[in-house]
Structures are given as structure tokens and as C-alpha cells.
Amino acid sequence: MDLISVLPSASKSCVCLHKPLSSSTHKLKPFCKTIRILGMPRRWKFAGPSMSLSTVASDDDIQRRTGGYHSNLWNDDVIQFLSTPYGELAYRERAERLIDEVRDIFSSMSLEDGEFSDLIQRLWMVDNVERLGIDRHFKNEIKSALDYVYSYWSEKGIGCGTKSIITNLNSTALGFRTLRLHGYPVSADVLKHFRNQIGQFVSCPSETEEDIRSMVNLYRASLIAFPGEEVMEEAERFSEKYLKETLQKIPDCSLSREIGDVLEHGWHTNLPRLEARNYIDVFGQDTKNMESNRKTEKLLELAKLEFNIFQSIQETELESLLRWWNDSGSPQITFTRHRHVEYYTLASCIAFEPQHSGFRLGFAKACHIITVLDDMYDLFGTVDELKLFTAAIKRWDPSATDCLPQYMKGIYMMVYNTVNEMSAEAQKAQGRDTLNYARQAWEDCLDSYMQEAKWIATGFLPTFEEYLENGKVSSAHRVSALQPMLTMDIPFPPHILKEVDFPSNLNDLACAMLRLRGDTRCYQADRARGEETSCISCYMKDNPGATEEDALNRLNVMISGVIKELNWELLKPDSGVPISSKKINFDITRAFHYGYKYRDGYSVSSVETKSFVMRTLLEPVPL
């Protein structure tokens, strides 16, 4: 009997609303070819159950597994006693004046047309307002500046100015990166013109600050690679090696710290608000030119004010999140991880425009619910209980709790109430009812959890391909993104939504990215908890003799390929879908990727993740 179709005998009204997973529409799209390339045979493997984990006896005398997770780091006292003065009117008025002054700086650049630095000056302004996190105020100015730069773009790149005789690596690398990220059709072949006669990138032996900065921008550009762009891979290897060697030679200064940040976070794990916080510390410290100093002072003051003013908004939102967490009964759910503040911080780092409060709170709530459900299906619930819960969710009726164990009743109502509330918010933003659409996404997610619970209970180990197909759904990327995304002031009509959400390649890749990266960070801890099934174990079973190191190497190759495909899905020209519509889903991928950068930062949030929360959420920037 198919596990997904099993219905509780207690209620004949519990009906299956969609197909069992074995016939799901969640197919492997970009990965079937990759799997064949990696030599992964398609066959079933069995393994005995592994439950080397501490258990606890519940009130019903059932021995239940526990994850041994640390408790919530951000209790009521921490949140309730936050206080910042930057919500006061005087700070907002000062920020508005600075915004006007920075607009004047953009406008003054048109007076320098035809000079020897007009192109690099425009790129410098655009790059810096973006890295400082203040670009939302200057959308028109940015477009005007980039249109001007692109009008002088050639297949060999650009120089510092329109009167420059030769092209320049720094201008070209920065221009290529910025133009590509804004959707201009620029070819990576432009970088080939900076290789020597035997096709290799070479560095200037003088190693001036300009030479070093050229390599910084070459490295940053190389990370925005599309599939098949070999020159970008060469540029990344060369510039990364150069910058690492340079760090060993130059003294500690703002440039060395900038290089360290760029190497540490790259682009795919460099969340916009985190980048702004780090860049504020190094921006303009070594500027010697008086005119440049005046520009940097205004940009820096505005960036600091904007960062701190947003924290006053976050305080209010955190209070709202804390009320929801308490009212939902979450503190009484003792078997799960409580990371709602960490999830809120991630959301704040990718969407920190004031009007996106619904997204930030919705993302934190959705991710908290996902975590509770994940821990319940993986650890705490029995298979029979989980069948009941899965069927109850498909009924979508509070009376469905009658057939649930006591500990599941509150969890069910948390899901039911929160999904309904987020659907109401989405209806206000999108002008249509999306509840049934969201329910289907949640049902698909729970079906995939149910499949994994069956594997855990029976000790069954699927093929890599089958595991990944199910794992893309159980990654829960889709349900974490869908409803929060629909609360934004970005239009998502049905024809656009299907290019961003399921069944789009963007959604498929985002889900795969989270599953692959998550498994490389979690598989050892999961195994200790009795969860044998992972990308690593399935790959090793499919490839007898392969070691864990072999499996990790293969997965890292796949992840690198997925990143390039994600870049393409976001930035490909003439897709008919605005970049702004795709970018929030793309940035959610970056947020999850950051959470797994050093370890499983969601299970163990007391180290790097805690520092991340402190730096971007709780600590103001000194003015």
C-alpha cells in the first residue's frame, strides 16, 4: 500500500487531494543529465535501520527520538528590551537630506561626459551604493548611469573613460559584473582580451592598489558565471589565488579587510544587508583624494543612518514575531529547534526595504513551521501518527484535530492559522485568492516528509536519483518562499508565478541547491540521530567503493553547477520575466546557502549564526 494514500480510519472525510509521490510531477529537470555524467547507476539499495540516538519516554509511554538541539537563544527579555533611538524623526530627516545630496552627486557626473574617468566614476557610484545597501533610493540614477556605460561597451571592454585609448581590466571587470547583474546582455568573452598570448591571465608585477583592486573586481565578476563559461572559471581560479597570496603580503588595512570579506563571502552567500554591514567598516578609509572624500563621507553617513533606522523597524517586527511565537503555542513544543529570530534575520538581510514587513515576518513564520514539522516527521512522530497528520492537513479543517494525538493538535492549528493568515495578506497584495495554491505546496512538502519518515522507519535507502527527487521537495524551499513572496508589492500574476515558483527551472534549482548543500553539512549529525538517508549515503550505495570524501567532492561539483544555472535563470536575457520578480526567490536560495556556509547553522545557531544575528539585527553601527 502506498504510504501517502493511507487515510485514518477515524474519519472517512479525510481524502487524498493529490497524487502519491511515486507519480508526482516533481521531476528531476537539470539533474538527470548531471547524474548520468557522474556515473550514478539507477538501482535500489537496502540498509538496516540505524537508531544510535538517545530516546525519551513521552506521556503515552512511546519511546521517541530527540535531536538534542540547543534551546532558543533569544528569549523574551532579549527582544523586549531592545531599544534604538534611530526611529526618531530627526534621523529620518537627515537621511532624506543625504539622499538628495547623493542624487546631486549622480547628476553632477553628466557634467564630466567625455572625460578620461567618466565610465569608472559611474561604475564606482553604482557599485558603492549597492554594496552599502542604499541603492533602493537611486533606481533611476543607477539605470541612467549604466545606460551610459553600456552605450560605450565593446567586445574588448571599456577604459576608465570615453576618451581612454585602451581598455582597462578594472573598468571592464567591474562594468561586466554590474551590467550583467542588471540584465544587460554582456558576454564573458570580453575577459579573454586580458589574457596573454598563451591564453593565461597575468598579473601586473607592480601590485599597486589599482592592480589589486582590478583583481578584486575580476574575482567578483567571475562569480556571476553562466554554465559553459570556461573563461569565468579560469578568471575565478586566477584571481582567487592572486588575492590569497596578496593577503599574505600587504599590511592590515581597509583594502586587506575588503579582500578578506570578498573571499569569505563571495557572492552567493553574501547577503545584501550583511555585505552592507561589512562594507561600512572598510569603505573610504584609505581615500586620499579630497573630492572622493566628500563623496564617500555622504555615502557612508547615509549608509550608517539607513542601517540603524531599519533596526527601529526590526524592533517592532520582532515584537510581533515574538507574540506570534508565544500565541501559536511554540514554547510548549519541546522536541524541536526554535530558530524564528534567526530566520527573521535572514529575511531582513535579503529584503530590508521598509514596505516588505509582510515578507520578513512571513518567511520567519513559515521557516519556523517547517522546522517544527521537519523535526516531528524525522524524529518525534511515529509513522502511524504522521499518516494521521498528513491526512488531516489535506482535510484543512480544524475538526481534523479530533483524530490527532494531543501533541499534534497545537502544531496542526499553528499551520492552519498561519497559512490562512499569510494567504489573506497575499490576497491584499496580489488581488486574488492563493490559499488553495499554497495548500497544495504544503501538502506536497508533507508528502515528501512522509516518504522520508517511511525510509527512516524501515531502514530503506533509495537510489541517489530517487532521493534527490523527493529531497528537492522536502528541502521545503518552495513553502518557505511562496507565501512570503506573494505578500510583497511585486506583481505575481499566474503567468509570472509559474516562471518563479513550481514548475519553473528556477524553483527546481533552488530546491536542489538547498537539498545538496544541506546534506553536505548535516549528514553526520543526521546519521547520529538515526537518519541514514542522505545524498552522501545514497551516492555511496550507488557507487560501491566510494568514500564519503568521494561523495562530497561529487556533490560540490554539482553545487557549483547549480549555482551557475541559478545565475542563468535569474539573469538570462529576453526571458519575459522581470529580474525583480525572480530575484527574491533567488535571494532566498542565497540566504539558506549562507546558513549552511560553515556548518548546519540552523541546528547549531550558537556560533557563526549567533554572531550574524548580533551584527546585522541587534548591534547598531557607530556613527
UniProtKB/Swiss-Prot annotation:
Example GO molecular function: terpene synthase activity
Gene3D superfamilies, alphabetized: Farnesyl Diphosphate Synthase (1.10.600.10), Terpene synthase, N-terminal domain (1.50.10.130)
Cofactor stoichiometry and binding remark: Binds 3 Mg(2+) or Mn(2+) ions per subunit.
Annotated Mg(2+) 3 binding sites: D526
Motif (DDXXD motif) on chain: 374-378
Alphabetical list of InterPro entries matching this protein: Isoprenoid_synthase_dom_sf (IPR008949), Terpene_cyclase-like_1_C (IPR034741), Terpene_cyclase_plant_C1 (IPR044814), Terpene_synth_N (IPR001906), Terpene_synth_N_sf (IPR036965), Terpene_synthase-like (IPR050148), Terpene_synthase_metal-bd (IPR005630), Terpenoid_cyclase/PrenylTrfase (IPR008930)
Reactions that this protein is recorded to catalyse: (2E)-geranyl diphosphate = (1S,5S)-alpha-pinene + diphosphate; (2E)-geranyl diphosphate = (1S,5S)-beta-pinene + diphosphate; (2E)-geranyl diphosphate = (-)-beta-phellandrene + diphosphate
Record bears the keyword Cell membrane: no
Protein function: Monoterpene synthase (TPS) involved in the biosynthesis of monoterpene natural products included in conifer oleoresin secretions and volatile emissions; these compounds contribute to biotic and abiotic stress defense against herbivores and pathogens. Catalyzes the conversion of (2E)-geranyl diphosphate (GPP) to (-)-alpha-pinene and (-)-beta-pinene, and, to a lower extent, to (-)-beta-phellandrene.
Protein name (record): (-)-alpha-pinene synthase 1, chloroplastic
Organism: Pinus banksiana
